[in-house]
Amino acid sequence: MSTAQARHILVGSEEECRILKARIDAGADFAEIAKEHSLCPSGAYGGDLGEFSPGQMVKEFNDVCFNEEIGVVHGPVKTTFGYHLIEVTDRTD
């Protein structure tokens, strides 16, 4: 069974998401940005969501985690929760 591991940053606006992504792309630490800005409780852990299986996350989030490149920050990804930056850290098939 497939699994993925990821970390994310959840914010309320696409603009804020883009600004934070630019900071990360420029070398800012993902975990520190998550701790400072994420609306998700996982922000306290650097955005780490641990391991999960297909279908455990909302569709838009799931699609990134099980189809996109590992080790790259993806986003903004819009879900019913807000806007995410997602980094898939591992995946098994």
Which residue ranges define each predicted feature?
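Proteostasis/folding factors centered on peptidyl-prolyl cis-trans isomerases
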Residues: 1-10, 60-93
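Short phosphate-engaging motifs
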Residues: 16, 57, 84
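N-terminal targeting/tethering segments
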Residues: 16-17, 26-27, 92
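Noncatalytic linker/hinge segments flanking ATPase motor cores
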Residues: 19-21, 49-52, 74-78, 91
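Peptidyl-prolyl cis-trans isomerase
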Residues: 20-60
